[in-house]
Curated annotation (Swiss-Prot):
Family: Belongs to the synaptobrevin family.
Gene from which this protein is expressed: VAMP3
This protein's record includes keyword Hydrolase: no
Protein name: Vesicle-associated membrane protein 3
Entry's localization field: Early endosome membrane; Recycling endosome membrane; Synapse, Synaptosome
Length: 100
C-alpha cells in the first residue's frame, strides 16, 4: 500500500472530479427547479385566462339567448301585423264587392 504523495494526489484528483460532478448536478437541478417554477407560473396564468374565457362564454351564451328571444317576439309581432293588414285588406275588398 503506497501512502506517498502520488496516492494522495490521485485521491485528491478523484475527490475534485466527484466535487465537480456534484457541482454540475447541483447547477442542473437549480435550472430544473427554475424551469418548474416558471412553468407553474405560466400554468397559473393560463388557468386564470381559461376562467375568464369561461365566464365570458357563459355571459355570451346568456346574451345570445336573450337576443334570440327578443327577435323571436319581434318576428311574431311582424307576422301579427302582416296578418292583420291582410285581413283588413280582404274585408275592404269584400265590402267593396258586396256594395257594388
Amino acid at each position: 500500500m503506497s501512502t506517498g504523495p502520488t496516492a494522495a494526489t490521485g485521491s485528491n484528483r478523484r475527490l475534485q472530479q466527484t466535487q465537480n460532478q456534484v457541482d454540475e448536478v447541483v447547477d442542473i437541478m437549480r435550472v430544473n427547479v427554475d424551469k418548474v417554477l416558471e412553468r407553474d407560473q405560466k400554468l397559473s396564468e393560463l388557468d386564470d385566462r381559461a376562467d375568464a374565457l369561461q365566464a365570458g362564454a357563459s355571459q355570451f351564451e346568456t346574451s345570445a339567448a336573450k337576443l334570440k328571444r327578443k327577435y323571436w317576439w319581434k318576428n311574431c309581432k311582424m307576422w301579427a301585423i302582416g296578418i292583420t293588414v291582410l285581413v283588413i285588406f280582404i274585408i275592404i275588398i269584400i265590402v267593396w264587392v258586396v256594395s257594388s
